[in-house]
Amino acid sequence: MPKKQQHYKTIVLSDIHLGSKWSKTKEVTHFLKQHSCDTLILCGDIIDGWSLMRGKNSKWRRRHTNFIKVLLDISHDTKIIYVRGNHDDFLDRVIPLTFSNISVVKDYIYTSGDKRYYVLHGDVFDKVTSSMSWLAKVGDVGYSFLLWANKIYNRRRLKKGLPYYSIAREIKLKVKASVSYISDFEKHIVDIAGKKGCQGVICGHIHYPEKKMIGNVLYLNSGDWMESLSALTEDYDGNWNVYIEEKALTEVRDSESETVSHTELAV
């Protein structure tokens, strides 16, 4: 395994959607091989059971197995907390479950220093809203088309030496309905965390990485590995950052050695 480039106290990943043809599995596997941590939080939708059940172009591939192997390998030195999401809700049959250094749970309270963070995927929001936006429907035809367009667009950008660019993120920033959905989601999730007596909340679900204060609660969203290629990282001083890959490996060539640049957004 390649030498680690960076070590963190905590890393949070979510919405990898193993089994979906849109999953950037090689990128996230590369990320885990290049970054280590004491605690790895997998914040839901790691495995896309919905896509696997639908079949068609979605199926379990060797690269998905390789990702699981990397998880098992790093679990010898890293505590792994797997919080189930809506696309891997098949885990409801077995949770809570602990084996070796891996725990599979519905939700989790993560304590760092004197702060408590409520960890959940975020699909609980779907149960209280009647406006089921395409943002929450990974299998939706419109969203699939957007991911296809994103792939074609970035393939051309990368041939020109330009960094990865998420079309979906730009749309979410400009479309009123999307902005409203994200805002309502954030407020609801923060409210839940506050009622749990937590100073922060860690979630995923909406494929929109973010770090910001909402009232007295620190809102942290790890984004996804279908379009955003993002994660959350925490250093030993308790500082959180949004990590975003700037290049998609599979858009250039099928290689583990491809250099991947990134940015860390300290908001």
Question: What is the predicted function of each stretch?
Answer:
Residues 2-11, 110-118, 213-219:
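Beta-strand-turn-beta hairpins that frame and shape the catalytic cleft
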Residues 4-9, 20-112:
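Core catalytic region of metal-dependent phosphoesterases/phosphodiesterases
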Residues 9-17, 52-56, 170-177:
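Short, basic, glycine/proline-bearing loop/turn elements
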Residues 11, 41, 81-83, 118, ...:
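Hydrophobic/aromatic beta-strand patches that form the interior of the parallel beta-sheet core
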Residues 15, 45, 85, 121, ...:
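Active-site glycine-centered loops adjacent to acidic/histidine catalytic or metal-binding residues
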Residues 100-106, 123, 128-135, 179, ...:
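Conserved beta-sheet core of the metallophosphoesterase superfamily
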Residues 122-185:
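Active-site-proximal loop/helix segment associated with metal-binding centers of metalloenzymes
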Residues 251-267:
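C-terminal regulatory/interaction regions
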